[in-house]
C-alpha cells in the first residue's frame, strides 16, 4: 500500500482541523480549538489504488511558526488553506508557499490551494482571485466547506494525484536520458 505524507498549512482559524476531521471522521467540528499539531492516518482508495494518507494538521498560530520547518521537511504534499471570508489568510498563502519552497529547496513541490468556508454567504476573497493565484503557482485550486463536506475529499485526493505525478516525474527524470531508476537502461514495451 502506498503511503502519502500530506501536510495541511494555513493561517489560524481557516478550518485546517475541521477539513481534516471531516475527511477522517465524517463530522464537522464547529468549536475553535487552536491546534499545535495533530496527526491522522486513513486508508482510502483513489483511482483504484489503495493509499494510506498520513495527514499532519498544523498550527496556524504564529507562536508555533518555529515548528514549521520540521514538518515541511517531512511532508510530500501541502494543502495550502485560506478562508474565503478572510483576506489576510489569503495573503498569507504566499508566505507558506515560499517557506515550503525554501525548506524543500525546490520550486517544484506538490501543493493544492484550498479556499475553505465556501458555505458562508459573505466572502472577501473572490473565486477569480484564487484561481489566478493558483494558476500563477501552477497548482490546482479547490473550494471547500468543512461544514457541508463540499470539496473535502476532492482537495485531499487532488493532492495525492499531484504527489503521484511528482513521483512519476522524479522517477522518469534522469541526467542523460538513458539511465533508468536502477542505473540501467529502461525499455518501454
Swiss-Prot record:
EC main class here is hydrolase
Q: Give the family per the record.
A: Belongs to the small GTPase superfamily. Ras family.
- Give the UniProt entry's GO cellular component terms: Golgi membrane; plasma membrane
Q: What is this protein called?
A: GTPase NRas
Report residues of the Glycyl lysine isopeptide (Lys-Gly) (interchain with G-Cter in ubiquitin) crosslink.
170
Residue numbers spanned by region Hypervariable region: 166-185
Broad class of the protein's primary localization: membrane
Provide the E.C. number(s) assigned to this enzyme: 3.6.5.2
Select a single GO molecular function from the record's annotations and give it: GTPase activity
Q: Lipid attachment of type S-farnesyl cysteine occurs at which residues?
A: 186
Taxonomy, top ranks, is: Eukaryota, Metazoa, Chordata, Craniata, Vertebrata
Coiled-coil annotated spans:
none
Lipid-substituted positions (S-palmitoyl cysteine)? 181
| UniProt subcellular location | Cell membrane; Golgi apparatus membrane
Q: Which organism is it from?
A: Cavia porcellus (Guinea pig)
Pfam families for this protein: Ras (PF00071)
Q: How does it sit in the membrane?
A: Lipid-anchor
Amino acid at each position: 500500500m502506498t503511503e502519502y505524507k500530506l501536510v495541511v498549512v494555513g493561517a489560524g482559524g481557516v478550518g485546517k482541523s475541521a477539513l481534516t476531521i471531516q475527511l477522517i471522521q465524517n463530522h464537522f467540528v464547529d468549536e475553535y480549538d487552536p491546534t499545535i499539531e495533530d496527526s491522522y492516518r486513513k486508508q482510502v482508495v483513489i483511482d483504484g489504488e489503495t493509499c494510506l494518507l498520513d495527514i499532519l494538521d498544523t498550527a496556524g498560530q504564529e507562536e508555533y511558526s518555529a515548528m514549521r520547518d520540521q514538518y515541511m521537511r517531512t511532508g510530500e504534499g501541502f494543502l495550502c488553506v485560506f478562508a474565503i471570508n478572510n483576506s489576510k489568510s489569503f495573503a498569507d498563502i504566499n508566505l507558506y508557499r515560499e517557506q515550503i519552497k525554501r525548506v524543500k529547496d525546490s520550486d517544484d513541490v506538490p501543493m493544492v490551494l484550498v479556499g475553505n468556508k465556501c458555505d458562508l454567504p459573505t466572502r472577501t476573497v473572490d473565486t477569480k482571485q484564487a484561481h489566478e493565484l493558483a494558476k500563477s503557482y501552477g497548482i490546482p485550486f479547490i473550494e471547500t466547506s468543512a461544514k457541508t463536506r463540499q470539496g473535502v475529499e476532492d482537495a485531499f485526493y487532488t493532492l495525492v494525484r499531484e504527489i503521484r505525478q511528482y513521483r512519476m516525474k522524479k522517477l522518469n527524470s534522469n541526467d542523460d536520458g538513458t539511465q533508468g531508476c536502477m542505473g540501467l537502461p529502461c525499455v518501454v514495451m
